[in-house]
Structure formats: C-alpha cells, structure tokens
C-alpha cells in the first residue's frame, strides 16, 4: 500500500456534485494503491455524527441560534480531527472531506451574518493547524443545485429547507 499524508476537501452547496467527485477520486486513488479515508462534515466520527443529527434536525428549524449552530459545527470538526483525520494522516493515509471549515465561513460567517472574524477565531482553535492542503470549490447555480437535491427523493433537512436567498448568500 502506498502512503501519503495528504488532506483534501471539496466544498459546494448541496447538489453541486461534491460526493460524486469525491467517490470518483477515491476510486482512482484506491486503484493506484493508496489508503484513503473519506468523511463528511459534519460527521465522520461517532460524536460528530450525533452532532450532525442535531444540526440537521428539522425540529430545530427556527429554534437553534446562529451561534449555537456555529459552535456545534466546530465541536463536530474538533472531534473528527482528533479521532479520524489526525490519526489517518499520521498513518500515512489520504483524507478527503466532503466539506470542511470553508463551509462554516460561507454558511455561518456570511449567510448567517456572524462574520468572518468570529468564524476565523473559532476555526483556528478548533483545527489547531489541521487544515486541508487543497480545497476544491464546486460552484453551481442555486436553483440547479436545489433541483438535483430534490431528485434524491429525500425530505430536506433543516439547512436544505432554507430559502433560495440563504443559498445565494452562501
């Protein structure tokens, strides 16, 4: 097995094709003999997945404060870094994340209006130097992304159910 200590992330709104591109990349890297760890954010570790459930729960729509949302995303990220990302990198694996800190800047910093300065301060504490060396942003028209998401046939989660204007700010 080939070793590498690389950490990459893909960013974009829901329906932009992140997961599809990540799966194709992982397939190609695995065929070349690399050990690859895939994770999604929020999630990827047991505690982080529980935090994800809270963040996406439609029962909290209109109840969860923007700062709570920001702190929960950072809590999930801190856990997945400690439990999954850093150990994988230390073991010479490639880590590919379906979203990472840039989503927090876009969603909470800009779309929620909390500001880049606050997000930056929390991100520095949360990540403690563990950042992707490359992030690819998949840009797609909001309406096209929403149409793709709707084709999945799943009920929209708390964030997916935001108005189009929210995603335009993202």
Predicted regions, residues:
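Phosphate-binding P-loop
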Residues: 1-5
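Hydrophobic anchor at the beta1->P-loop junction of P-loop NTPases
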Residues: 10
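P-loop (Walker A) phosphate-binding loop of NTP-binding proteins
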Residues: 13
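Conserved lysine of the Walker
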Residues: 18
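Hydrophobic positions on the alpha1 helix immediately C-terminal to the Walker A/P-loop
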Residues: 21
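Hydrophobic alpha-helical packing residues
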Residues: 25, 29-30
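ATP-dependent small-molecule kinase phosphotransfer cores
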Residues: 32-127
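A glycine- and Lys/Arg-enriched "phosphate-lid" helix/loop adjacent to the NTP-binding pocket
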Residues: 104-170
């Amino acid at each position: 097995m080939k070793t590498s200590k690389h950490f990459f992330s893909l960013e974009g709104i829901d329906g932009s094709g992140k997961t599809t591109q990540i799966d194709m990349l992982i397939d190609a890297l695995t065929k070349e003999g690399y050990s690859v760890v895939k994770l999604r954010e929020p999630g990827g570790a047991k505690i982080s997945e529980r935090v994800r459930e809270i963040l996406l729960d439609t029962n909290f729509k209109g109840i969860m404060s923007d700062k709570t949302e920001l702190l929960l995303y950072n809590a999930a990220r801190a856990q997945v870094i400690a439990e999954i990302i850093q150990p994988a990198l230390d073991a010479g694996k490639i880590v590919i994340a379906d979203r990472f800190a840039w989503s927090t800047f876009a969603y909470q910093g800009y779309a929620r209006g909390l500001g880049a300065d606050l997000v930056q301060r929390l991100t520095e504490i949360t990540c403690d130097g563990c950042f992707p060396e490359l992030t690819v942003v998949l840009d797609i028209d909001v309406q096209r992304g929403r149409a793709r998401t709707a084709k999945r046939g799943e009920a929209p989660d708390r964030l997916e159910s935001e108005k189009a204007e929210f995603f335009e700010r993202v």
